[in-house]
Structure formats: C-alpha cells, structure tokens
Amino acid sequence: MKYEKLLPRFLEYVKVNTRSDENSTTTPSTQALVEFAHKMGEDMKALGLKDVHYLESNGYVIGTIPANTDKKVRKIGLLAHLDTADFNAEGVNPQILENYDGESVIQLGDTEFTLDPKDFPNLKNYKGQTLVHTDGTTLLGSDDKSGVAEIMTLADYLLNINPDFEHGEIRVGFGPDEEIGVGADKFDVADFDVDFAYTVDGGPLGELQYETFSAAGAVIEFQGKNVHPGTAKNMMVNALQLAIDYHNALPEFDRPEKTEGREGFFHLLKLDGTPEEARAQYIIRDHEEGKFNERKALMQEIADKMNAELGQNRVKPVIKDQYYNMAQIIEKDMSIIDIAKKAMENLDIAPIIEPIRGGTDGSKISFMGLPTPNLFAGGENMHGRFEFVSVQTMEKAVDTLLEIIRLNNEVAK
C-alpha cells in the first residue's frame, strides 16, 4: 500500500458514529461531533501540526502545517467534514474486498443486500482494486471520512515521511454538520487565514467541482376549515387538498427524479397535516441565478393565485435562501481550478469537471471571501448501505493534493 496508514485511519474514523442531527439547535449538532473534533485535534498534534485549536463558535478543529520554503507562495487550506448523513451510523463494520474482479456481486455482510454491477455499473471501474464497503446495516461514512483520512495522510507525509517535500503554509480544518446544510454557516475565514482552499468532499476519481446549485428552502402553511364531512358541501376547505393542489401546480417534470445535469427542480421533502391545517416542506435548486429566482417567484405566484381563488389568505409560503452557486466567486480567478486540473493531468487522472447537483461547505465559504472548490475523495453510492470506496482512489486523492502543493510552489504570491 502506497500510504501505509491511510486505510487504518479511514477504518478507525468510520467506526465512530458522527451522524448529524437536523433537529438540533446546537453547533455542532451532536456531542459526538464535539468529541470527535477534539479527538482529531489530538491526532493532528501527534502528527506535528502547529497551532491546533478547536473553535467553540463553529465546531471546527484547525491546525497548521508550517511552510518549509522561503518562497513567497500562496497559503492553501484543506477542509473536510466530520459528520455523516442521515442514515444508520451506529456499529459501522467496514468490509475489505481485495483485488475486486469488476464483475462479481458483492455480498453486504449477512444481510439480503448486495452490490451488483447490474444495479451499480460503476463497480466495473474498480477491477483489480481494494474496495471498502458496508455490512449492509449502516452507511460507510466515506462522505466525508475519506477526505478526513486523506488530509491527515497528507499531513503525515509532509511532516514525518518526507519532510523535505517543499511546500508553503497549509491550513487544515475539519468541521461539523455539512450533511444538514449548516456546517459552514459560522466558518471563520479570518481564523483560517489562507489564500484559497479546497474541500476534499467529492466522489469518484477525478471529480473537480466549482459550480454548485443555488439553493432555497420553502415551507408552505395551508389553513383549512374543517367541518363534519356529512354536511361539508360549500363549507369545508380541506388543508390537505390545498397542499395537493399546490404541489400539482408546480411543473410536473421539474422534480429530482426527472432532471439531470444543469436542470433544476422543486423537491417535496415532507407533507403532513389534517383537514384543518397542513404543512409542506420543499427545497428549490438551480444552477442559473435567473432560473433560481424564477422558481422562488413561481412558488409565491401559485400561493397568490390560490388565495385569490379562495378569497382568503389560506396558503402562506415562507421561502429562504440557503446557499448560492459558488461559480459566481471562483470564476473571477480560475487559477485554483487550473492548478488542480493540471495536478490531475500530471498524474494521468482525467479531470471530471461538472456542476454539482447539490452543494458543499465550499458554496458558503466561497461567498465569505475564500474561494473553495471541491476535490474528489473517492466515495461511491454515498449516504446509504450501498456506499463503497476504493483504497487506490483514496491514495490518488493524496497524490493529487501533493501535486497541487508542488505546483503551487511555482506560483508567486
């Protein structure tokens, strides 16, 4: 194995349950995330990182790999998130499959679940590689503990294995609650103090992402008028029916299951209620600013039209922006994309530069003034029991970070 401690680190990290809690009012959202951040801080100190500190204000643990060159080069930040998605993360029991043949069905522990190339054709890309997968009862946590392990392995390499590898100052940060969309809300750009950064939070080999969705959330309250159904004619207003009518007024094909690429959507996350009152929760996504604003306006227009027809204000939307397409920031200086692309090409990795149908912590951090695109970390089928990662892809992620650092030495600050 190229980096001896990369896999052991990853296996250690994924066994810790750091599932974030969207219903929490604290930062981080769970005590487990606080404890894991402190554990990472101790590990960072053990590797030799300097100025390691935990920020109570946002749950991030930060450390520094000091420069070992006199060149005036740009300071690089590397970020990954410690939390995992909303799927069972208790008792993660990673399974290791060496020299996968690229075609066999992989049994997930003792469960009835399998990784079948017929269902997951991406498996065919991993012939001859070592895969880490789940036992079928939990997620794996490669999102984003692959990124955490890769950054820690990079730090170990620079500080202990090959301390003569020339580099400028590198700052490392691990934070909470990315999966519930609030992890970067309180990120401290001034404390991190770098010229540019990358989140190591992408998927398969070669992913390089700087264009995200712009995102908003919408909560629609429906006020009905409930009377006995036997005498309801011309009197009852069923709030649940209002919710159905509202949803049906949205474009039928603008849904996640019917869109791809640069196409945006409305996604109904939750609908509950009674004839008296109901509540629908949506997310709104689009890459283009104009279309994003049009989607938000449409949700208000539908409510206004329904209220006019009802003669009463019974449909009440509240729409709040969540994050914006970070391409608006990064396209002002594409050098950090160019250097990452060049690093991959130097390593015979084909860069995959496509819009993210989602967001990253970098979306918010970029709008705070720190351009932060996203690099691959290796995970596939993330957020569930079918998640897996290739050890060789994780190694190439470390290689890519090292090559970015090497190329950065050639760019004067």
Curated annotation (Swiss-Prot):
Which residues are noted in the entry as Zn(2+) 2-binding?
143, 179, 383
* Entry's Gene Ontology molecular function annotations: metallopeptidase activity; tripeptide aminopeptidase activity; zinc ion binding
* Chief place where the protein resides: cytoplasm
**Record localization:** Cytoplasm
GO cellular component assignments: cytosol
Q: Which Enzyme Commission number(s) are listed?
A: 3.4.11.4
GO annotation (BP), single:
peptide catabolic process
Q: Which Pfam families match?
A: M20_dimer (PF07687), Peptidase_M20 (PF01546)
Q: How is the cofactor bound?
A: Binds 2 Zn(2+) ions per subunit.
Per UniProt, where does Zn(2+) 1 bind? Answer: 81, 143, 201
Q: Which reaction does it catalyse?
A: Release of the N-terminal residue from a tripeptide
Is Repeat tagged as a keyword?
Answer: no
Give the record's note on temperature dependence: Optimum temperature is around 40 degrees Celsius.
Task: Cite the NCBIfam families for this sequence.
Answer: peptidase-T, PRK05469.1, PRK13381.1
Role, per record: Cleaves the N-terminal amino acid of tripeptides.
Q: What is this protein called?
A: Peptidase T
Species source reads Lactococcus lactis subsp. cremoris
Gene name?
A: pepT
